[in-house]
Structures are given as C-alpha cells and as structure tokens.
C-alpha cells in the first residue's frame, strides 16, 4: 500500500441499487503526496466503459448519455474493477464525492477492503458556507486552482467527474490531512444547515434549543448527527442517539 496516493473513483451506472443495477463506466484520478508533503493531482487519469450485463434505462441514459452501443463488448465489472480499485503500487485510500454511492458497487471484495474518503462529508466540514455541496456547485463556488475546464466536462461522465472531485480532495488533504479526512468520512455528514422543512437553510446555531433537540430524533442520520453536535456544543452533552435510515440525497 502506497502512503502517498489516494485514488478518486467515479461511477456511472444503470441505477442506484445493486444487484438490480450495475456499473457502465468507471473513471479515476490519483492525488499524490509530493516530496514536500503537499498533495497534487497525478498526471494520469482515465475512464473505462463497463458492460453492465443489462440494458441501460432511458432515465439514466438521460443523465450520463451512455448508450448500450457504447458499452457493448466492454469488460464486465467483476473483471475490470479489481485492477482499478487496487492499482499497482497500492493506494492508502479510495475517494469519491458521496462515497456511499460508489461503495455500493465497489465492495470490499473488489477493493481489497480499501478505506474511503468522502469528499462530500469533508466539504461540509471545511467549506460550510458553500451554497450547496454537490461536486459541481463546489467546483464553481471554489474555483479550484489548476482545474482545466475542458477536462472537467461533460458532467455526469466518469473521468470528468473524478477529475473535478480530485481537485476538491487535493485541497482537503492539504487543509486537514489524510487522517482527519478518513475520520470525518467514517462519521455521518455534519450538515452546516438544516436541509429541509420549516427551518430549511438555517444554520444550527440560529435555532432555539427546542428546535435543535427535535432534530436529534429526525429520520435522517446526517440530520440527527448534526443536531446532536449542536446540542453538545451548547450543553456539553449528547442526547440519546436513535436509529433510522441511512443518509438521503441532501444539499
């Protein structure tokens, strides 16, 4: 395992729920630690079509514009994934924007049990004032240094999206360090603002105590976690944690 490389992964798929859905394209871009300790994008990055073994639905074609003819004759996921997820020389971690999605398809068996960095969760911590935390909003809100506009297009294709994510990851690694990003990624997302309902868009510190405590019982894991952290900030203790469904598509 190389302690000097994190591989950013982006997948385009036939849907969001394997095994009913499958991968039709994988893109990657490495971020490498230099001799001076700074992290920078590696020169190499690429993408490969993947045969999903089923037709691509029109609703997902409309997102990434990958058609059945594009993937016909490509390698199957189980055959192509290990070499990309476990590159020669190793990687200290894999990364993705909303990594929970990629992890549905990049199973521990395929990735060799790789650790993951979620650049979405890390963005919530490092750039809480961003108007949104999607890969593309962060791209234009932050305007990362060195990002080649043409290489980052079209959106919703595997290499361009991985390339954009890698610029966020580079800046996150240089700001907070590898261990911190891994720790943040292992926790639910720390949302800076309420994502829905009557308080949508308000920062947690703007809410009264009763409202904040109410959100600690929310159905969404990220909302509960964020409200609990605000309670801890105010009172020094955490409310009893509940259980509920995993993170939804927020912010």
PLM features: residue spans?
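Conserved Rossmann-like nucleotide-cofactor binding loop
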Residues: 14
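Generic structural signal for hydrophobic core residues of well-folded globular domains
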Residues: 126, 172, 215-219, 234
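Glycine-rich, highly charged phosphate/nucleotide-binding loops
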Residues: 70-80
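Short, surface-exposed, low-complexity cationic segments
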Residues: 206-229
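Short linear clamp-binding motif
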Residues: 245-251
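Charged, low-complexity intrinsically disordered segments and flexible loops
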Residues: 225-227, 231-244
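Metal-dependent phosphoesterase core characteristic of DEDDh/y 3'-5' exonuclease domains
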Residues: 2-8, 19-66, 85-202, 210, ...
């Amino acid at each position: 395992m190389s302690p000097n490389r994190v591989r950013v992964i982006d997948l385009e798929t036939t849907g969001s729920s394997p095994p009913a859905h499958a991968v039709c394209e994988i893109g990657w871009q490495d971020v490498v630690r230099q001799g001076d300790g700074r992290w920078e994008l590696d020169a190499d990055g690429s993408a490969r079509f993947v045969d999903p073994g089923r037709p691509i639905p029109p609703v997902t074609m409309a997102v990434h514009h990958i058609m059945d003819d594009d993937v016909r004759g490509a390698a199957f996921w189980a055959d192509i994934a290990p070499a990309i997820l476990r590159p020669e020389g190793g990687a200290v971690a894999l990364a993705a924007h909303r990594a929970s999605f990629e992890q549905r398809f990049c199973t521990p068996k395929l990735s060799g049990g790789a650790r993951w960095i979620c650049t979405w969760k890390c963005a919530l911590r490092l750039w809480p004032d961003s108007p949104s935390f999607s890969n593309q909003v962060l791209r234009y809100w932050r305007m990362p240094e060195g990002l080649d506009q043409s290489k980052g297009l079209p959106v919703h294709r595997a290499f361009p999206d991985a390339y954009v994510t890698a610029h966020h990851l580079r800046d996150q690694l240089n700001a907070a360090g590898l261990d911190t990003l891994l720790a943040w990624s292992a926790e639910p997302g720390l949302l800076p603002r309420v994502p829905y309902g009557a308080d949508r868009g308000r920062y947690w510190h703007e809410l009264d105590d009763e409202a904040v405590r109410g959100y600690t019982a929310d159905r969404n894991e990220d909302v509960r976690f964020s409200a609990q952290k605000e309670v801890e900030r105010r009172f020094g203790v955490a409310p009893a944690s509940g259980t509920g469904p995993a993170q939804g598509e927020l912010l």
